[in-house]
UniProtKB/Swiss-Prot annotation:
Keyword Manganese: no
Taxon lineage: Bacteria, Pseudomonadati, Pseudomonadota, Alphaproteobacteria, Sphingomonadales
The protein's Enzyme Commission number: 2.7.4.6
Binding site for ATP: 11, 59, 87, 93, 104, 114
Family of the protein in this entry: Belongs to the NDK family.
Listed name of the protein: Nucleoside diphosphate kinase
CDD domains the record matches: NDPk_I
GO (cellular component) term, any one: cytoplasm
Primary localization class, coarse: cytoplasm
GO biological process, one term: CTP biosynthetic process
Originating gene: ndk
Organism of origin: Sphingopyxis alaskensis (strain DSM 13593 / LMG 18877 / RB2256) (Sphingomonas alaskensis)
């Protein structure tokens, strides 16, 4: 397997409960390395742009409101098959369906407040990383 990068967001429900360290530890324990990280409070424009793919979906407005409701931690993760590895440790979107030991099973409050976002493909990872990070901010 090749070493690749993926993008992760620790969402407001998790940062509000001071879970940034616990979530990051689970990611690192899964073999992912944090090569860039910053805590930000997304603007409405940032959230709408980031989630533009969902603009026509009925949950778009609620998603944007949730993502701007508090600080988030955006991260670039690196490791072998990083997208898949990150998605495996995150667990299913719906925490009720997530496997034991995953981030969402352990920390998510609901399907909406599910603690983390992770890229779903290498292509989307590259786009999402570039949305929040300049190349010089990523230190491998």
């Amino acid at each position: 397997m090749a070493v690749t990068r993926t993008f992760s967001i620790i969402k407001p429900d998790a940062t509000r409960r001071n879970l940034t360290g616990a979530v990051t530890k689970m990611l690192e324990d899964a073999g992912l390395r944090v090569v860039a990280s910053k805590r930000i409070h997304m603007t409405r424009e940032q959230a709408e742009g980031f989630y533009a793919v969902h603009k026509e979906r009925p949950f778009f407005g609620e998603l944007v409101e949730f993502m701007i409701s508090g600080p988030v931690v955006v991260q670039v993760l690196e490791g072998e098959d990083a997208v898949k590895r990150n998605r495996d440790v995150m667990g299913a979107t719906n925490p009720a369906d997530a496997a034991e030991g995953t981030i969402r099973k352990t920390f998510a409050e609901s399907i909406e407040a599910n603690s983390v976002h992770g890229s779903d493909s290498d292509e989307n990872a590259a786009t999402e990383i570039a949305y929040f990070f300049k190349p010089e901010e990523i230190v491998g």
